[in-house]
A protein has these predicted regions:
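Aromatic-residue-lined binding/catalytic grooves and analogous aromatic/hydrophobic interfacial grooves
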Residues: 39-179, 191-194, 212, 267-270, ...
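Catalytic or ion-translocation cores adjacent to nucleophile or general acid/base/metal-coordination motifs
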Residues: 1-30, 192-194, 206-207, 222-293
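Active-site-facing alpha/beta catalytic cores
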Residues: 13, 30-43
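Short hydrophobic beta-strand that contains or immediately precedes a catalytic carboxylate
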Residues: 215-218
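Short, hydrophobic/aliphatic alpha-helical segments
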Residues: 189-190, 196-212
């Protein structure tokens, strides 16, 4: 936020690219950093804040490892890790963000192309495909036929845009573009390597959470659809007589909520992590630590209910109805 408390954004790419999948977005180069510097110089913040912001860009986004990364997704993993460490009192944080779809893609290629696992059967066998179609239909993150929504097992990438696929006669097809791919292990493997195919959210989570048993935390929507996916996967495993997978998944937790909490404000606006750097005050740092040690999870969560309301309905809550539940730290 600038001195007028108006949100300003630094754009790495043109806004026309906002709908492009991260999966196929190319890595940014040094010229992007140079453009960011120009945007910082034109922003309505103090000269001291411009220096702080430029230092952040240099330390995080102009980092040599980030600039040498092969893809934008790899850059995000590196820069988010570095961003956490550049926040006040957060130097010891080791938060790593990885691309779920890439993990699922590599696991398919290494372990599920030919071995008769439940994942192999769901993707490549006619019986498994039919079971997937019956059990995952209508689940958010999977697919719906009427009205058409989501994609069956994979998304296709053509001209840097996602294509939704349906199952038709053993092929994945997009009828609007005549795109067609045979669900053959060699073909699917090649398309995953070239990043022409992306595992859907449903397939990715089924592999990571259900087949391998990793606990996957997520937002308030995920705890709903991940639970639905678990029962869909269990039904498929039962029909395929895959008892080993069946036993493993029964202990998988699907309601692990991971949510943001609001602690910092600029006047009456929620402050971002970048604001925390630009408007940092020693007394605010001390008060934040005190707040984190004293407030309850319930109190912290309730501060974001208006934000959840906006996400779900598209409408904003009148500030007079927002309860002052926890002590608010003002950076200005």
């Amino acid at each position: 936020h600038n001195q007028n408390l108006v949100e300003e954004r630094l754009h790495f790419f043109s806004l026309k690219n906002r709908h492009l999948p991260v999966w196929c977005t190319e890595a940014y180069k040094i010229n992007v950093i140079q453009n960011i510097t120009k945007q910082i110089n034109q922003s309505k913040i103090t000269s001291t804040q411009k220096i702080l912001l430029q230092n952040l860009v240099n330390n995080v986004y102009a980092n040599a490892k980030a600039l040498n990364a092969k893809s934008y997704a790899d850059q995000i993993a590196i820069t988010n890790y570095l961003l956490w460490q550049n926040l006040p009192n957060c130097a010891d944080n080791a938060m790593v963000y990885l691309e779920m779809e890439q993990i699922a893609s590599e696991l398919i290629q290494k372990f599920h192309l030919h071995k008769p696992t439940i994942i192999n059967q769901l993707i490549f066998s006619e019986v498994g495909q039919k079971l997937y179609a019956e059990n995952y239909h209508g689940i958010s993150g999977a697919f719906t036929n009427d009205p058409p929504h989501g994609s069956f097992l994979f998304w296709a990438i053509q001209n840097k845009m996602r294509l939704a696929l349906i199952l038709k006669d053993g092929y994945l097809v997009n009828e609007e573009t005549n795109y067609k791919i045979n669900l053959d292990p060699k073909i699917v493997s090649d398309k995953l390597k070239s990043r022409e195919l992306i595992p859907t959210t449903a397939l990715s989570l089924s592999i990571i959470s259900f087949y391998y048993g990793l606990t996957c935390g997520g937002g308030f929507s995920q705890v709903d659809y991940l639970t639905s996916m678990k029962w869909a996967y269990l039904n498929c495993a039962s029909e395929l007589n895959n008892e080993t997978d069946n036993l493993l998944i029964k202990n998988t937790i699907t309601n692990y909520l991971v949510a943001s909490f609001a602690f910092l404000y600029l006047n009456n606006n929620l402050a971002s992590s970048i604001d925390w750097i630009l408007y940092q005050k020693l007394e605010a740092i001390e008060l934040l630590q005190q707040n984190l040690n004293q407030i309850t999870l319930n109190q912290a969560f309730q501060t974001l209910l208006p934000e959840f309301y906006h996400i779900i309905t598209g409408e904003f809550v009148d500030p007079k109805y927002i309860p002052n539940i926890i002590p608010i730290l003002y950076l200005t």
